[in-house]
Amino acid sequence: MSRRGTAEKKTAKSDPIYRNRLVNMLVNRILKHGKKSLAYQIIYRAVKKIQQKTETNPLSVLRQAIRGVTPNITVKARRVGGSTHQVPIEIGSTQGKALAVRWLLAASRKRPGRDMAFKLSSELVDAAKGSGDAIRKKEETLRMAEANRAFAHFR
């Protein structure tokens, strides 16, 4: 048994303009080579583009997109008796949000075009509507978990 105490949960900080933790999560995940100011520029331009496209509150579109992509169950590879099984496990809201942000950014990067702000805004609007690559990824994960439900007792 470990003698160390359990680590305290760190709360995510909010971004300077919108005072929103989800925006800060996006900024920290989009970050490359330590260029945080560039990451902020990309996110803020994407938020402006969402405002222009939907003519609604862009933060509510962002929340709706992340809520739509967030999974509540995922699969984890588990080795049992020489064979590897995909075992479905339930995940918490924090881990689910982190996965959702990761999937949204991956789907945005895959989209055609040069401007990341445009690609991200398009993906967020699509995800809020219930379509797009990130939603497809969530559905695929849920299908995988449902198919491997028989291995749930390996948890």
From Swiss-Prot:
GO annotations of cellular component type: chloroplast; small ribosomal subunit
Main location: plastid
GO biological process terms on file: translation
GO molecular function: rRNA binding; structural constituent of ribosome
Superkingdom classification of source: Eukaryota
Keyword Ribonucleoprotein applies: yes
Its job: One of the primary rRNA binding proteins, it binds directly to 16S rRNA where it nucleates assembly of the head domain of the 30S subunit.
Family that this chain belongs to: Belongs to the universal ribosomal protein uS7 family.
Self-association and partners: Part of the 30S ribosomal subunit.
Protein name, UniProt field: Small ribosomal subunit protein uS7cz/uS7cy
Native organism taxonomy: Eukaryota, Viridiplantae, Streptophyta, Embryophyta, Tracheophyta
Gene coding for it: rps7-A
